[in-house]
Amino acid sequence: VPATFTLDGVTCNMDSGGGTGGGTGGSTGGDTGGGTGGDTGGGTGGGGGGDTGNRVDNPYVGAKVYVNPEWSAKAAAEPGGSRISNQPTAVWLDRIAAINGVNGGMGLRDHLDEALKQKGSGELVVQLVIYDLPGRDCAALASNGELGPNDIDKYKSQYIDPIAAILSDPKYAGLRVSTVIEPDSLPNLVTNAGGTPTSTDACVTMKSNGNYEKGVSYALDKLGAIPNVYNYIDAGHHGWLGWDSNLGPAVQEFAKVATSNGASVNDVAGFIVNTANYSPVKEPNFKITDTVSGQTVRQSKWVDWNQYVDEQSFAQAMRDKLVAAGFNSGIGMLIDTSRDGWGGSARPTGPGPQTSVDDYVNGSRIDRRIHAGNWCNQSGAGLGQRPTAAPAAGIDAYVWVKPPGESDGASSAVPNDEGKGFDRMCDPTYGGNARNGNNPTGALPNAPLAGHWFSAQFQQLMQNAYPPLS
């Protein structure tokens, strides 16, 4: 049944909001942070030598991208993993301790020093995920964070300020720093913070106390003041914000946060979509304008009245709306393609049958999830497009922000000291909730805590990679 309901005469979508969003970024993101978090301590700073502080329109053009040696070692240790272990992935700062390194792992300065070595005489981008807001991940449990809902001052003084101080070191001024700002946070305020079946008490709290907004504004302001830092705000994905009833309010929310509490639109290089999620860059076999026997594909259960069927069309349309709302015309979009390839034997090779609109869409779509609101350790997923600079109009890069092989969340309750709860969306036996239209989760079994290494998933991602691995 399409997860659609009417609120004050406006048609809304349950899945649109929390589902994929609530979790996908959050939890998948979160965990990613969780695992790589500690060591991935950090960052992207500015590098020594080179053209110090010369800002460019797209930091990825003409530059190498930092390969995190800690992720690379895990990937290379897997059978067949050396085929991708040299790919650049983001470093997740998912807790205060990650700044200096967790459990003996690399901290922020360690990553920046390594980045200077990788840079050589050319240009290099270091990708850093800022992910430690108060009351983090309010619509999911797999990647809850260390800071309570009211710990905004701690977030500023013990998290953002130390990161900004390190990134400001002249030693790193020649590096290009791409920062992904707080996955899931602002989209959760739009769809899960009151008045919808997907709302959670935690998101209502974070909307009412304003600390997500204050935190993101502060991060934009402090990091945006550093000449070689390029801030990209997380903007959910098409299966979360692709409905008009969500996209318009999301753009307004982004504009509000980028122009308050000291932040300016000049602090924003762009936005990122599909962070730690599984939505394809492009659906090659069908378009949103297709019809079957006079019925638009938007009426199918899969599309569920969404305006988009894939991430690139969503990102390009959102970019236009953001510029119209006052953001600079030079902003660019990033798309996380780390796990959205959907290759392998189950990948359709052409359009589905025209027997019904549902048969057509289900037979056409390369996204083989049970529901677009499913975000945790998805069965059948594969590595997506390899990181690429300027692949399409308005798109700064395809990036691997979520490091492949890091779990989105545990498939059963696991005691831990990382603050990570058990989210039933990671349980393959769970029947679902409002955020995924009450469908099965499609999650892989035997998954470890968010961010921890999940060998079985890594092997599946390689097996189902698209383009295939050679």
Regions found by a protein language model. Give the residues of each.
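Substrate-binding cleft of extracellular glycoside hydrolase catalytic domains
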Residues: 102, 117-232, 249-256, 262-267, ...
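Ser/Thr/Gly/Pro-rich low-complexity, disordered linker/stalk segments of secreted
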Residues: 5, 10-53
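Surface-exposed substrate-engagement region within the catalytic domains
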Residues: 76-80, 241, 245-422, 426
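Short beta-strand-plus-loop segments that form exposed binding edges in beta-rich domains
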Residues: 1
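Structural recognition of the beta-strand scaffold that forms the well-ordered cores
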Residues: 64-67, 90-94, 125-130, 177-182, ...
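Surface-exposed cleft-lining segments at the edges of enzyme active sites
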Residues: 93-100, 201-208, 235-242, 295-309
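N-terminal carbohydrate-binding/catalytic regions of secreted carbohydrate-active enzymes
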Residues: 53-167, 384, 402-470
